[in-house]
Amino acid sequence: MKKSLIGISDENKKFLEDLLKYYIDQADSYNQFANEYGEFSKSKREIAFGVIIGTVYSTFLQTYANQQLEVKLDDIQEFHDLIRNNLDKISKALDEDTT
């Protein structure tokens, strides 16, 4: 498995990027899911956002566990960078699907 300069391997990074793109493309279904739990939060959008990020993060951790890899600080920081680099896409997708 080829490793990028720090953190997440190239293969795992590609997998996570593709997974995140999938969830962005499915934002409408997460908005619908959030409608079911709207009574627990003032913002259904925040619920949908949290579900997307939480699901991708859970998959990130499970991928490492399946490969018997230790999650290191560099890996977590790179994961957070991946999410930060896609915040606008996630937000835009959630906003588009609520109109």
PLM region spans:
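Short terminal alpha-helical segments
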Residues: 1-36
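Short, surface-exposed loop/turn segments at secondary-structure junctions
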Residues: 2, 38-43, 66-76
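Generic alpha-helical structural element
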Residues: 5-8, 45, 49
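Charged, amphipathic alpha-helical oligomerization/scaffolding segments
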Residues: 22, 55, 82-85
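Amphipathic alpha-helical binding modules
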Residues: 69-99
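Short, flexible helical or helix-coil boundary motifs
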Residues: 23-27, 31-34, 60-63, 67, ...
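Acidic, low-complexity, intrinsically disordered interaction modules
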Residues: 46-65
